[in-house]
Regions:
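Catalytic core of DAGKc-family lipid kinases
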Residues: 1-97
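Hydrophobic residues in beta-strands and at strand termini
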Residues: 19, 73, 100, 169-171, ...
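Fold-independent oxyanion-binding glycine-rich loops
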Residues: 19-21, 28-30, 101-103, 135, ...
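Glycine-rich phosphate/pyrophosphate-binding beta-alpha loops
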Residues: 29, 33, 99-115, 183
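Short acidic/glycine-rich loop or secondary-structure boundary segments that cap or lie
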Residues: 34-36, 79-82, 105-110, 138-142
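Gly/Ser/Thr-rich active-site loops/lids in small-molecule metabolic enzymes
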Residues: 44-52, 103-136
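ATP/nucleoside-binding phosphotransfer catalytic cores, i.e., glycine-rich phosphate-binding loops
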Residues: 117-125, 132-206
Length: 206
């Protein structure tokens, strides 16, 4: 299959993400499930796919930690005159999980990145899909969050779902990050920027 792509594939210019000075291809994330991505045994990932993330993540639910964060991000909005323009917005809240993605799926879940029936995610549009999960106030809210994640319906009152080309994320304490499933260090301030069509990859023609 790989040989066929090399011989007859087409070039696709894909976005990549900058995380300060580091580069990531499909996801930068923090919070409750991020340790799962680099802490789950590879054998379990291979055998169970996205269920491995759920099974491993459940272990962390008894010790949910939230992070007070300020997220400043650039987005595109309609200016009311039939035109779009870039503007800057700020979100401040307590978050238990967040991910900045340029991917059609994460851990086997297609809608977690905003990809509803493959319509909402474009891999070379210069925009990240951003999901920020708020700290639940009680077990009922926690259950609602888990149901939303399991059913891949993430645009709820317990989450912020947005698109952005550039973000500045600040916190009072160090937060551990994962970049493409690998440990990305602890940070109190990170800048993420989408580099549009930064790399060329070969993809099948069909």
């Amino acid at each position: 299959k790989a040989a066929e792509v090399i011989a007859a594939g087409k070039v696709f210019a894909c976005d990549v993400g900058l995380f300060d000075e580091d580069v990531f291809v499909y996801i930068a994330a923090f919070g409750i499930f991020t340790e799962v991505s680099y802490g789950t045994p590879q054998e379990m990932k291979n055998m169970l796919g996205h269920m491995a993330y759920i099974l491993e993540g459940v272990k962390h639910l008894q010790n949910i930690k939230s992070y007070q964060m300020k997220v400043t991000y650039k987005t595109i909005e309609n200016n009311g005159f039939g035109e779009t323009e870039e503007c800057e917005k700020v979100v401040e809240d307590d978050f238990i999980f967040g991910m900045i993605t340029n991917s059609l799926s994460v851990g086997g879940f297609k809608s977690l990145t905003g990809n509803v029936m493959g319509k909402n995610v474009v891999l070379n549009d210069g925009l990240f899909e951003v999901t920020l999960v708020k700290m639940p106030k009680n077990p009922v809210e926690l259950n609602s969050i888990l149901v939303a994640l399991m059913s891949e319906k993430v645009d709820t009152e317990f989450m912020y779902c947005l698109k952005s080309s550039e973000l500045l994320i600040e916190s009072q304490e160090e937060v551990a990050w994962t970049l493409d499933g690998e440990y990305g260090g602890k940070h109190t301030c990170v800048k993420l920027k989408n580099k549009q069509k930064a790399i060329d990859i070969l993809v099948p023609t069909a």
